[in-house]
């Protein structure tokens, strides 16, 4: 995916001068004029000033740069933790008032005084109701137990010395403790590397004595992994997206069946070989058929894939759907794009999912675009997608990496945060005029798996059913723990039901829209 270490890295001071984060318009001014937008529901975002933070470092930090979103102090406002690479991570505590301009303060605790970090994923690892952080590193990873006040304490976990770039977690049937997996990139100890020197990956399952490691091999330089119940049979399997730049010939995308002894799905199961410069995984039921499409970021074409039949067979959607996003859509750099984090979400609340793709050159790869703006692909009524990144104001030219679409100020609109390599972290507030209705659904369970990882939520607005799985993992080096957001168009009420982890469906219940709904498993 990039050159060997040691090639020339040019200064980065001038990069991103046209970036949206440098616009002088304030959020407050845009909020005051938002009703005057030319086109109803045309997406609009305004840059938000935030404490300075940069993801930096040499060759080992060309990848990574993840962003974790979690409510670390129980005030229902999403806080941010951004990996720093050679810099320490930062924790931005959300101080926003509902419906007002987004504000953050730097509240980085001593436990995050770490270097060589590549990513961060939030989940409740010890079932105490406080969200924890898995910090991925070039070196030993660190699990931090949350204390409920945005401070953390290191947990006793030894995952070895690897170049960690991906993470996912789930709760398997009959288990009170989580199963988690860590994806590793190049084996730095291989003297023949870095090419054709991909490290193995690790699966950690609970035992009476803690967790035991199962080595998942072959490894193909994973940059994103995700436990997902793709078959909707109650068992999450482990998808891996891998970087062909380093596995060269013999690798491919992978899907591990989480049986007593994990095994790879093969052609005999219907699995088809796919190769790409896999950077990130996102899943969403875009066509409302009850099955998730899979969106994989890469160099050149981004790959949106649909399941074929009941098995693990996937094929690319037609190019005409508008999801390839293979080249910059503004500027005069016609070289292929480089995609990283993909985040689905309905930014206009019109009932159709949209997709944000963080873009940016690895460092100075001459075969790929240097002026490579982020994408905001807006879902259209016919199932296609239309580019609106420039119109919306999020077409940053920085080297973007991790990202999140999440409601940061409780107004029912999804806002945007992006980590950049060798450039400041950016946050944008969604100020779209005349949006549709929405529903936010937060699930909790008592005693174990407090965030209901593995649950499915279905919301019926009378025209279609949106199905959503609660997961931990995917993306590029970071993820979101929090309520699930549904855009609902003109619906004033919807029907809702839950399939709790390893349980049955609840009855349908009718609820009003435009509210934050919290449900606890009986």
Regions found by a protein language model. Name each.
Residues 37-38, 42, 46-57, 152-154, ...:
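Gly/Ser/Thr/Pro-enriched helix-cap/hinge segments flanking short amphipathic alpha-helices
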Residues 38-45, 88-107, 140-155, 192-212, ...:
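Beta-propeller blade repeat segments, especially FG-GAP/WD-type strand-to-loop junctions
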Residues 46-58, 109-111, 267-272, 317-333, ...:
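Surface-exposed loop and turn segments in beta-propeller and other repeat-based domains
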Residues 49-87:
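Beta-strand-rich domains and repeat architectures in extracellular enzymes and scaffolds
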Residues 58-62, 110-114, 157-161, 215-220, ...:
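Surface loop/turn motifs at the tips and blade-to-blade linkers of beta-strand repeat domains
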Residues 64-72, 93, 117-127, 131, ...:
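Beta-propeller blade termini
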Residues 77-84, 131-137, 178-185, 237-242, ...:
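Hydrophobic beta-strand segments that make up the repeating blades of beta-propeller
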Residues 151-153, 159-258, 262-282:
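Solenoidal tandem-repeat scaffolds enriched in leucines and small polar residues
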